[in-house]
């Protein structure tokens, strides 16, 4: 069943989704617009997911951010960026979603309910002030 969906499970509980186009005989297809700009992809991802983290696998702050959300009970969508992709995060887009929060700089950057919360420091501040859980409940990422 997993193979039919393009999923592979590895020994360390990692699941990989194969995004190669399906064969012509398949009745389902994955629509990927290769013409879509990086900015448009980012906008789409932000609008489709209640909690999304733009992360780097080599960043310890990204790991702490993911662990904090997991501890609360939220499974965020995580987009791992390579070093060359980090520069593709447009600052104008960050300004549009930030609500006045300065998020200029490298990831991690977390978006909750289409609003840029910022980096790890901002996320921890929300948590310590007691505002994070209600915000996650409001966007449907957490049920209490």
UniProtKB/Swiss-Prot annotation:
Gene3D superfamilies: Glutaredoxin (3.40.30.10). This is Glutaredoxin-C6. Residues 39-143 form the Glutaredoxin domain. GO terms for cellular component: cytoplasm. It is found in: Cytoplasm. The lineage of its organism: Eukaryota, Viridiplantae, Streptophyta, Embryophyta, Tracheophyta. The keyword Electron transport applies. Its main location: cytoplasm. It comes from the Eukaryota. Keywords: Cytoplasm, Disulfide bond, Electron transport, Redox-active center, Transport. Disulfide bonds join 59-62. InterPro entries: GlrX-like_pln_2 (IPR011905), Glutaredoxin (IPR002109), Thioredoxin-like_sf (IPR036249). Belongs to the glutaredoxin family. CC-type subfamily. Has a glutathione-disulfide oxidoreductase activity in the presence of NADPH and glutathione reductase. Reduces low molecular weight disulfides and proteins. It comes from Arabidopsis thaliana (Mouse-ear cress).
